[in-house]
């Protein structure tokens, strides 16, 4: 099916935003059905797809025309009081439109969970949607998954913020419920295989990772991967899903309605008990520790301009289409200044920073910070610098990560920190001169990391604007 046309709904969502580029890479033609096409404007692949404006509840004649496989990734969780009924109506409309258009296959990503009366409203709705999509004579493949691991996934972001912010947690009973988390890269691979296979397939497949664990185990694994101290979990049996969803809304940026449905779903065991999707579609499940480590790795890479991404890692990072709170917490201090000088003359001055030259502002504060770093085993300011700036070289207590003359200098902190920090300068030609953008970025690790930023932030207000002004002032025109 490499030359087939595939309709993807939910392309601006978490899974859809990762599935579309994978499908394009496999050689299929992609059409995206979106209510608001402007939401796809930031996607790097938008020019390679056919975009149709509309909703799954609308007339889908145009969207379905000439389509071989229709992918259903829409989920209206918490969208109004009648969202369960609306989901069912939309799915039925989609299935009937697919049948009328002669679509060969529907592929749907649903939710794991034993189909009985104990299922949460969220999971029951997911499975009812699957049944509605399969109600016509169009072959329907339903991939059921539980917790998906990757930056941008609501489940993963909830896990991330809970583990990062709270070293001690009072926990409800649902943290002891069994689940089978799966890496986003595995989900994308399974979906691509289900969409592109030439085999006649249909029915329900269940997707899970190699480990069956509890949510508490996941938090412990996250803490280990993130270099945090072991989380202390104190069981409190009377903490209901309703109360815990409001608590999650308080300590994480995940919206309360979404947190409520996610928590309600965690009351149910979400493990593979039926036909295994990974085996059926030839996908090797990624271990949880590896999946979390990759998600954390690309979270850090996301702050670093780079041209390299492992073909697997790319699925784990937060994308332009994800919510603003996806990808973890990043604190930043950004300053801009313009100069009549061209970029090469500004960069020539910038390239002298550090070592004996110093840091242009707050020299005593830099030295005190270096001294404190040495006291706790860090490199301090004693390493100095080489005459030329080269990627990988030390620069006081920084490491040079990127040098692109005359536009970019990026430094990564190697001082002892409860997090990761970068200092970047971008030089952009502007009206015959230069726009200089100086950005300090900090990704905190745990509660201590957040407290650290609160302590040093007032000093940034003094040091960074003066530093930028003095760099620009010190630059001299070339004769």
PLM ranges: what are they?
Residues 2-28:
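N-terminal Rossmann NAD(P)H-binding glycine-rich loop of SDR-like oxidoreductase domains
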Residues 38-101, 111-118:
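NAD(P)H-binding glycine-rich loop region in Rossmannoid oxidoreductase-like domains
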Residues 28-35:
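Conserved glycine-rich Rossmann-like NAD(P)H-binding loop of the short-chain dehydrogenase/reductase
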Residues 413-461:
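Beta-strand/loop substructures that line and gate deep hydrophobic ligand-binding cavities in soluble
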Residues 330-331, 338-347, 351-418, 470:
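Glycine-rich portal/gate segments that line the openings of hydrophobic small-molecule binding cavities
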Residues 11, 19, 26, 116-228, ...:
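Oxidoreductase cofactor-interface core, primarily capturing Rossmann-like NAD(P)-dependent enzymes
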Residues 9, 33, 73, 106-111, ...:
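SDR active-site strand-loop-helix element
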Residues 194-261, 269-335:
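Mid/C-terminal beta-alpha module of Rossmann-like enzyme folds, strongest
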């Amino acid at each position: 099916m490499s030359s087939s046309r595939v309709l993807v709904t939910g392309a601006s969502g978490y899974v859809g935003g990762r599935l579309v580029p994978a499908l394009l890479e496999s050689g299929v033609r992609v059409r995206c059905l979106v209510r608001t096409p402007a939401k796809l404007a930031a996607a790097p692949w938008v020019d390679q797809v056919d975009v149709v404006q509309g909703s799954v509840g609308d007339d889908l004649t145009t969207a379905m025309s000439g389509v071989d496989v229709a992918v259903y990734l829409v989920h209206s969780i918490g969208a109004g009081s009648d969202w369960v009924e609306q989901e069912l109506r939309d799915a039925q409309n989609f299935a009937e439109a697919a049948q009328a258009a002669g679509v060969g296959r529907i592929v749907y990503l649903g939710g794991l969970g034993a189909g009985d009366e104990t299922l949460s409203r969220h999971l029951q709705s997911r499975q009812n949607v699957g049944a509605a999509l399969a109600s016509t004579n169009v072959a329907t493949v339903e991939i059921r998954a539980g917790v998906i691991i990757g930056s941008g996934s609501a489940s993963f972001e909830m896990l991330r913020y809970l583990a990062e912010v709270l070293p001690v947690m009072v926990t409800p009973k649902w943290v002891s419920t069994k689940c089978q988390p799966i890496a986003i890269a595995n989900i994308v691979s399974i979906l691509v295989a289900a969409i592109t296979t030439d085999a006649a397939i249909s029915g329900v497949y269940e997707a899970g990772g190699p480990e069956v664990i509890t949510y508490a185990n996941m938090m412990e694994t996250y803490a280990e991967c993130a270099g945090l101290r072991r989380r202390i979990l104190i069981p409190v049996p009377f903490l209901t899903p309703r109360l815990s969803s409001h608590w999650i809304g308080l300590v994480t940026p995940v919206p309360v309605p979404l947190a409520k449905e996610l928590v309600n779903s965690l009351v149910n065991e979400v493990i593979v008990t039926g036909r295994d999707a990974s085996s059926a579609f030839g996908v090797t499940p990624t271990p949880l520790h590896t999946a979390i480590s990759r998600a954390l790795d690309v979270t850090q890479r996301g702050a670093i301009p780079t041209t390299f991404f492992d073909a697997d890692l790319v699925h784990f990072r937060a994308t332009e289409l994800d919510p603003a709170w996806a990808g973890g917490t990043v604190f930043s201090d950004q300053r801009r200044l313009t100069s009549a000088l061209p970029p090469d003359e500004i960069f020539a001055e910038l390239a002298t920073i550090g070592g004996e030259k110093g840091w242009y502002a707050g020299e005593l504060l830099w030295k005190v910070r270096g001294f404190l770093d040495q006291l706790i085993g860090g490199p301090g300011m004693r390493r100095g610098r080489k005459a030329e700036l080269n990627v990988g070289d030390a620069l006081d207590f920084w490491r040079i990560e990127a040098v692109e003359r005359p536009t970019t200098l990026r430094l990564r902190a190697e001082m002892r920190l409860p997090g990761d920090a970068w200092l970047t300068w971008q030089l952009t030609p502007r009206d015959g001169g230069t726009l200089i953008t100086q950005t300090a970025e900090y990704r905190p690790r745990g509660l201590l990391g957040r407290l650290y930023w609160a302590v040093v932030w007032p000093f940034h207000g003094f040091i960074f604007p003066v530093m930028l002004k003095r760099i620009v002032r010190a630059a001299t025109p070339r004769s």
